[in-house]
Amino acid sequence: APGGGKVIQGIDLTIPDNKLVVITGPNGGGKTTLAKLISGLEKPDSGQILLDGQDITDLDITERAKLGISYAFQQPVRFKGLTVADLLELAAGQTLSEQEACSYLIRVGLCAKEYINREVNATLSGGEIKRIELATVLARHTRLTIFDEPEAGIDLWSFNNLIGVFQELQESLNGSMIIISHQER
């Protein structure tokens, strides 16, 4: 923390298998720091981070990703020249048929035929890019996905729809999800 203080201390958190956990609190309360510690983007000064009893504290983000931990940033990355289908294949780590790629988009509430060949760029709205990011989570088959303030950059209507998408996503995933939010709904 600026000035050398501790941002987070005394945390004992267990994320159950196949559950959706929402962590809320005020801005500056350490929510994003917690997400970055779990994902491996930041290292703790002390303590342990365990995944299924295995100490992963010293593993970096790449090693944790190989174990099935993924982190979705507040503002998803946009790629000029990369289509939605390309992004889904990158997430899956394999070539997908058009039907497979479209099935991920349909599950997050997007009309697949309209989006599958679109570029992941500034022409997509905040809500669209969030849904595409959720589709990549489905394609990735991760054990633990951390969403850091997924409501950032989208309007209230899109946010309310996104809540439903998260609930449906949780039911179809074979893994856990953490949503970090300053919204207390």
Language model region names:
Residues 75, 81-100:
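Q-loop/switch helix immediately C-terminal to the Walker
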Residues 55-70:
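ABC ATPase NBD coupling module
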Residues 24-26:
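The feature captures the beta-strand-to-loop junction immediately N-terminal to the Walker
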Residues 137-138:
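ABC ATPase C-loop
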Residues 47-54, 67, 100:
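Conserved ABC transporter NBD signature motif
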Residues 149-150, 157:
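Walker B catalytic motif
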Residues 39:
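Helix-to-loop junction immediately C-terminal to a conserved catalytic motif
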